[in-house]
Amino acid sequence: MTTDIRALYTRLPAIDRLLRDPAFSPLLAQHGHSQVVAQLRQMLDEAREQISQRQTLPDWSHDWLHACEQRLTAGQRSALRPVFNLTGTVLHTNLGRAIQAESAVEAVASAMRAPVTLEYDLDDAGRGHRDRAIADLLCQITGAEDACIVNNNAAAVLLMLAATASGREVVVSRGELVEIGGAFRIPDVMRQAGCQLHEVGTTNRTHAKDYRQAVNDNTALLMKVHTSNYSIEGFTKAVDEAELAAIGRELDIPVVADLGSGSLVDLSQYGLPKEPMPQEMIAAGVSLVSFSGDKLLGGPQAGIIVGKRALIARLQSHPLKRALRADKMTLAALEATLRLYQHPEVLTERLPTLRLLTRPAEEIRRLAERLLPDLAAHYADFAVSVAACQSQIGSGSLPVDRLPSAALTFTPHDGRGSRLEALAARWRALPCPVIGRIDDGRLWLDLRCLEDETRFMEMLLR
């Protein structure tokens, strides 16, 4: 070992000496002795490694207190951090999908602060059912006889199939054997539920006769799956829910539908593309309909099944129901969200998902133009401008439809793509990260989902 390297090692402080320093007292009080010691040991190990490999001390070694404090603070930061979603995808799966309404947030907070009547009947002091209040709301909204709540729509489909068709055949069109994110495939779910998949028709064309010809003594269900994350166009043919329900009634076979996203209002009234609604399926005679709570509905992650009372009872009594049931926070948020649908005249004001989806492009453009001057002055190495863009709904909802929007774009004057990557990384490291997208040599911030512009500017002008 050379004298110089030995000298570097001697400059490393002893942990005991650091802890005796009065300047460390606030850090010890805030984070505790064991966490501070563990962090200092890790820092010492890193410093020794750098001396060994590079014959230098770390940049932070001149101020152990500050470096230790920074690391401990970063380690205490929640893994679920609020961000600015300026990607252009409103229901972004990786960013938590639907933002909750204020009434839903308050309901969750209330449910967490005290015991609640989750499974307790106040009228007779007996055991109640956790789905009951929400089931009543869903029946009012959809016209169904009963409802069942689980923790997501994949679970809803699994439970629906396991409780009504295990060991038997389920007839589905080949054009509806969907796969969604995370490799969730309808055939795989059927296999897990113990069902036998019976494909009918072709990828682009399925007729009523295909379903009729497929039915046999082992047929348990006829199933419709809404292809919410892709579209087949051109020479196509599909059997709609009403026609399939009529076949089911004729042959005395239940018809079930997986809507995926599921919207409880006609989106076309807001100028958005129409999406199939559970109440339409129920009116058409479908026996069970499943859909998500955290997509177009705008609530928490949940799987919702509405339909015939006798079939819902089979779902409620199935062993999987307990494994898949929703907790009190989910139920509180979902109930509060569903109550908003009882007042459709103010839905676009109170439900964040619908508010963001219906936001006029001209309003978004005015916002971009208002923010442009300060940002252009601050980011002198970039050409900052306002550009028209297209938002998407996201989470597999209406995959081919786009919403006119406006974005702030950042183009490096020197044309180097590495500058865009560095800028995006810098924004992701902010206390409230700003998440955009890089495309066509520019960093885009689609402002459709930006509502707190004051906080946003505080972040970008740091």
Swiss-Prot record:
Cofactor requirement: pyridoxal 5'-phosphate
Catalysed reactions, as listed in the record: L-seryl-tRNA(Sec) + selenophosphate + H(+) = L-selenocysteinyl-tRNA(Sec) + phosphate
A single GO cellular-component term on record: cytoplasm
Main location: cytoplasm
Stored PANTHER family: L-SERYL-TRNA(SEC) SELENIUM TRANSFERASE
Subunit structure: Homodecamer; pentamer of dimers. Binds only one seryl-tRNA(Sec) per dimer.
Name of the featured protein: L-seryl-tRNA(Sec) selenium transferase
Organism: Klebsiella pneumoniae (strain 342)
